[in-house]
UniProtKB/Swiss-Prot annotation:
Keyword DNA repair: yes
Organism for this UniProt entry: Streptococcus pyogenes serotype M49 (strain NZ131)
Stored CDD domains: GIY-YIG_UvrC_Cho
MF terms in GO: DNA binding; excinuclease ABC activity
The protein's name: UvrABC system protein C
Compartments where found: Cytoplasm
InterPro entries: GIY-YIG_endonuc, GIY-YIG_endonuc_sf, GIY-YIG_UvrC_Cho, RuvA_2-like, UVR_dom, UVR_dom_sf, UvrABC_protein_C, UvrC
Key words of the record: Cytoplasm, DNA damage, DNA excision, DNA repair, Excision nuclease, SOS response
GIY-YIG domain sequence ranges: 14-91
Amino acid sequence: MNELIKHKLELLPDSPGCYLHKDKEGTIIYVGKAKNLKKRVRSYFRGSHDTKTELLVSEIVDFEYIVTESDTEALLLEINLIQKNMPKYNIKLKDDKSYPFLKITNESFPRLVITRYIKKNDGLYFGPYPDSYTANEVKKLLDRIFPFKKCKNPINKVCFYYHLGQCCAHTICHTDKAYWDRLIDDVKHFLNGKDDKIIEDLRSKMLAASEEMAFERAAEYRDLISGIATMRTKQRVMSKDLQDRDIFGYYVDKGWMCVQVFFVRQGKLIQRDVNLFPYYNDAEEDFLTYMGQFYQDKQHFIPKEVFIPEAIDEELVAAIVPTKIIKPKRGEKKQLVALATKNARVSLQQKFDLLEKDIKKTSGAIENLGQLLRIDKPVRIEAFDNSNIQGTSPVAAMVVFVDGKPSKKDYRKFKIKTVVGPDDYASMREVLFRRYSRVKKEGLQAPNLIIVDGGVGQVNVAKDVIEKQLGLTIPVAGLQKNDKHQTHDLLFGNPLEVVPLPRRSEEFFLLHRIQDEVHRFAVTFHRQVRRKNSFSSTLDHISGLGPKRKQLLLRHFKTITAIASATSEEIQALGIPKTVVEAIQQQITDNKNDRSSP
């Protein structure tokens, strides 16, 4: 704890509010809320914590706080601050967690479409469905049963679906709006689970077609009835009152939380959402934060009712979720919350079981690798790779694996400073010398094994730097790829030789992951540098365009091509004067003309 934090801790008020932890760069890494700011913030810097909280605390070099009038106000502010700053230690809902809905548009002649986003007053929504496949299957079934409008063509224009007998827009609907309204009502009833009348109508049509000897048409009606029956069986009835509701349950253990949400529509469980994440606050408070983010996400439909567990404050939930909040006390409804909670416990236990299994496998892999190479167990492995194109923008990267897992906070990037042209050996020599001379000088933690991406030449260069230039005794190995650019051989020893490594062994998979990761990290860094260099060279020597404005353009547009495609107004919106914008556009045009000239 530094002196600044010590001083600020003495000044904390006994009030509700939000606190924002910052790292050495001034970046907000965690946002929390508290009923009592003094007690909560001080708790981070006193006593012992679990590993993940210690990691958070180790990065805190400053904090701010905002006092609020109430705990409810603090909760709302916390949710907004998290969404604005996206701190790395806060709960993050998965980006791909939006579920598909079926939507009846509110056009004059409505259509049935699939969407993942809900817009207020933009139509009727049904769902969510577990995935796109299920939503499409339901829509295809509806398209065959109901001949409503399916395209955006003008109402008086014949479309493809009309010829298939799946659209009546050109005929009946064009003249009879009431018929159209009845058709949409039938679709609503179907999607709300009231499909008995529809099945009865289809069965009557099937029998009539059979009597007319129109067996193909009868078979189509039979298949439609079968499709509806199949869809029914995939939905478990959870409630007899046919109400739309979301049911929340959560479970905490070993510093982790699992939240389960059951989506119940028309009394049927149609999908569940599962999210697991580490929590640093009080469990109930982190659950409230999760709920706030869940519904503010705009991807989740807010039902008529939301069920919550007994331990959660109803008033706080009601402040962030605009619907009826129920804390069931007895009977079937309480059992539903208990079921969601039980599923959360099972999911969390499964995660721990998988983690334990993974730890055992990984621990075995690094132990076996050490035995194979006849070295101490390589708990810490540092791997290196170079990246350049014909010697331009040369860079290198280092990744670190601790206990067989990536330690991304220890990753390092290197711009090659002393090498001219495409010389991988010289580049590797420079990078290894820079890295391990610093390790030696500053007493940093040394790895148990160094891995270089390459063959005999790369390994010999690495050994020369480590052993002869720096006088260190760190084992060095090389990973060679085959013609398909896949991990193939492990080189080690004195003299170097190929180490026999079973292709299906855990240690081979570990080395394969390490090689892929260092290659990915190096190539990504090289692309960033190359793009920035290209960007800078094009925009050099433009009056009024200094480093800060160039950086602003790079962050916003990413590439010169994107700037060339942008309008003057879009560039000026970044705060760049019109005269400078005109100079930028002229420079890009001149460069393009120079390249196209013979």
